[in-house]
């Protein structure tokens, strides 16, 4: 029994985590067992998620299967983008220069700041009145 070649990548963004599997194929793209266009309703999110394929000119060469949890659609699209970029590196290390130059391999570390005690939000304080 021969097992199909597959490359895996993990991407995180804000509170979203995406597990990406790419296999040589004809360009299928599924997110949580649904077509990507159906899951990521906005073209902006879909374009963001597909960016590593566009940069490396490999969109029609791989079938992509993504399992993503947490956060909103923007964070999920960013997590998928990082996961795809990392999976492409496993497929071919030659893509590193293109992906690195565009910042695709850098995890965006910006996350929501925690609420502090005595304040209404992370930095928002109650309104102050001198008199």
UniProtKB/Swiss-Prot annotation:
It comes from the Bacteria. GO terms for cellular component: cytosolic small ribosomal subunit. Keywords: Ribonucleoprotein, Ribosomal protein. GO terms for molecular function: RNA binding; structural constituent of ribosome. One of its GO terms (biological process) is translation. PANTHER family: RIBOSOMAL PROTEIN S9, SMALL RIBOSOMAL SUBUNIT PROTEIN US9M. Belongs to the universal ribosomal protein uS9 family. HAMAP family: Ribosomal_uS9_B. This is Small ribosomal subunit protein uS9. The lineage of its organism: Bacteria, Bacillati, Mycoplasmatota, Mycoplasmoidales, Metamycoplasmataceae.
